[in-house]
Amino acid sequence: MSSISKRLSLRVSADVIYRGLTDTRLERLFPEFFTGITRKLTSSNKANSELQFTTTTYDSQIQIKEIFKLKVLESNATEIIYTTSTNIANDPVVESIVYMHIANILYALLMLETGYVNGLMERQK
């Protein structure tokens, strides 16, 4: 499978996104949802605002490599360039898994923005 790249702008600071991406509380609190899946931070370059994860499933049969590049835009806004690739090509089942994984990551980032913006609005009241 060739790499898939998505670009997303959020009204959240890069630091909040960085902490959200590296947070592992869900894996620790609900391990039953992560059976057979290992997600490791394989590279972190905070100076260049880049994170790289490797997600391995089912005895390393499927490996998903993810790179997040964070670029600070105007005040409190960040652009995320999210690139995904896998070790298996031309397999519709694996492609389906990867597309669902990408959708979940993008949804989680949008929910991070929603929670962040709502929290700011609550503070201003």
Predicted regions and their residues:
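Intrinsic-disorder/low-complexity, polar/charged segments enriched in Ser/Thr/Lys/Arg/Asp/Glu/Gln
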Residues: 1-7, 16, 50, 63-65, ...
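Hydrophobic ligand-binding cavity/cleft-lining segments
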Residues: 1-38
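A short, structured loop/turn motif at beta-sheet edges
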Residues: 11-15, 43-48, 69-79
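Short coil/turn motifs at secondary-structure junctions
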Residues: 13, 58-60, 73-75, 85-89
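Mature, Sec-exported extracytoplasmic domains of Gram-positive
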Residues: 34-36, 68, 89
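Hydrophobic/aromatic beta-strand elements that line small-molecule binding cavities or substrate pockets
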Residues: 38-43, 55-57, 64-72, 84
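Short, hydrophobic/aromatic-rich segments at coil-to-beta transitions
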Residues: 44-54, 114, 118
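A conserved amphipathic terminal alpha-helix motif
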Residues: 84-125
